[in-house]
Design a protein with these regions (language model features):
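Acidic donor-binding/catalytic loop of UDP-sugar-dependent glycosyltransferases
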Residues: 108-121, 260, 300-314, 384
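A conserved acidic beta->alpha catalytic loop
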Residues: 59-62, 254-262, 302
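Glycine-rich, basic loop-to-helix element that forms the pyrophosphate-binding segment
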Residues: 85-91, 274-290
Length: 445
């Protein structure tokens, strides 16, 4: 008989995945662990029927949680022993003593673990006395053997970055043969979480897992709103953001407003920072202030679609940067043309602008140096920098409606302004002094 032992604890708040605190709350840590347990259960379902499964668990918590996930086919037993090494040895020794010919034991925090990995451990055991499957951080996630060897587990510092090498050295010292399996990454730290975000962009199979779904839904979003003389729009925007406060960080960064903007921001509900004027300065300050995975830069005169956070998370499942499409609260045919050009430009020219609501990974934003120190064109240059780095842009499903306050007047005036904006960007690309371009732009606020 072949036996597969799953080593886990019952998901209990503030007991499981505690190394992820405070990046995740205790409740989120339980959610992540539970997602990984469901993935493990699906892996077990795919195993050859000749492999018997045992769930060895720490006794804290309600066992029915595990039984609801793994079902009645598995056999459930409490872990015994003082150290982690003792617990693993006792479990393997017990199962071997009951007639198993070979045993593999794995933890549950390996999102990439597949039935192929488990079955390959038994194939390796047919040719070796022991097997180890290493983790990227220097540990191992699976150990297997045909006879119980206590000395293999008598090492200090489980959880350190030398566990795999120390264990291999003990196996060699005992004169046992060793098969080494596929290396995978486990989830213990914030850095591990970010590594699996990267995997989500490239691995469609991983995106289908319970773990990937949890990671996607629990990415932290920071909304940064630069303000300057926005007394006519800031109250309306706060009403839109009211129901989002519990699910993300929201920061207003004022650039020295001379009207009532600052006093109209409800600081009992929203964080307010003060910066020197300039959207680049304001947005950079806001970005640095939030503990977020995703940054969403939002202009104050925007009207959001119904479920903006869900749209952002859907977008950032596949892209590292992107935006919403733009629309205008105007019936002017020219504004419809402007809308089409702006949205098409994201895919055609790989350029997005601030009024579309720029969305970007915080790590990527910091890596490229944040918004450049420019009085104007900071969003344009950000897009050019991303384009140079080969970053693909995505677009959310629905549109942000934004004010057409810059496009006042009749069709001729609107056309002249659109042409002027095009020429200003051309001047910037040619290297015309940015102060000259800024003077031509004229802030309407």
């Amino acid at each position: 008989m072949k036996a597969f032992i799953v080593f886990t604890r019952i998901p209990v708040e503030n007991k499981t995945k505690t190394r992820l605190l405070p990046y995740y709350t205790g409740k989120q840590c339980v959610g992540l662990h539970t997602a990984m347990l469901y993935d493990m259960a699906e892996t077990i379902e795919k195993l050859d029927t000749s492999i018997k499964t045992y769930i060895y668990y720490l006794p804290e918590g309600d066992l029915s949680i595990l039984k609801n996930i793994f079902g009645e086919k598995a056999e459930y037993r409490k872990q015994t022993g003082e150290s982690l090494g003792d617990k693993m040895y006792n479990a393997i020794s017990e199962v071997l003593s009951e007639g198993a010919e070979m045993v593999s034991l794995s933890g549950t925090d390996i999102p990439e673990l597949s039935s192929t990995d488990v079955e390959s451990s038994f194939k390796l055991l047919m040719q070796n006395d022991t097997v180890l499957f290493p983790t990227e951080d220097g540990g191992y996630y699976l150990v297997g053997m045909k006879k119980a060897h206590k000395d293999i587990f008598n090492i200090e510092g489980y959880g350190g970055n030398t566990v795999f090498e120390k264990t291999r050295a003990r196996i060699e010292k005992l004169g046992l043969s060793l098969g080494i399996g596929t290396i995978h990454r486990d989830i213990d730290t914030k850095e591990d979480i970010k590594a699996f975000y990267e995997l989500m962009y490239t691995d469609e199979n991983f995106r289908k897992t319970h773990t990937a779904k949890f990671l996607k839904e629990n990415k932290k979003i920071g909304i940064i709103i630069p303000t300057y003389n926005e007394e006519e729009t800031v109250v309306s925007l706060q009403k839109q953001l009211e129901n989002l406060r519990e699910r993300c960080e929201i920061v207003f960064v004022d650039g020295g407003s001379t009207d009532k903007t600052v006093e109209l921001i409800d600081t009992s509900k929203f964080r307010l920072l003060h910066s020197k004027k300039g959207r680049n300065n304001q947005m950079n300050m806001g970005a640095e202030s939030v503990e977020a995975d995703i940054l969403f830069f939002l202009h104050c005169d925007s009207i959001l679609p119904p479920n903006p956070l869900e749209e952002i998370l859907d977008l950032m499942e596949k892209y590292r940067a992107g935006c919403f499409g733009i629309a205008f609260k105007s019936l002017s045919p020219l504004m419809f043309i402007c809308r089409y050009i702006s949205n098409h430009r994201v895919f055609d020219r790989k350029v997005m602008f601030g009024d579309q609501g720029i969305i970007i990974e915080k790590d990527l934003f910091m890596e490229i140096g944040m918004y450049p120190d420019l009085p104007i064109m900071e969003d344009y240059q950000l897009s050019l920098t991303l384009k140079e780095k080969g970053i693909k842009l995505g677009m959310a499903k629905h549109r942000i409606y934004t004010s057409a306050r810059r496009f006042k007047g009749g069709p001729v005036r609107k056309l002249k302004l659109m042409w002027k904006m095009n020429r200003l960007r051309a001047k910037y690309r040619r290297g015309v002094d940015i102060e000259e371009i800024s003077a031509m732009y004229k802030d309407v606020r």
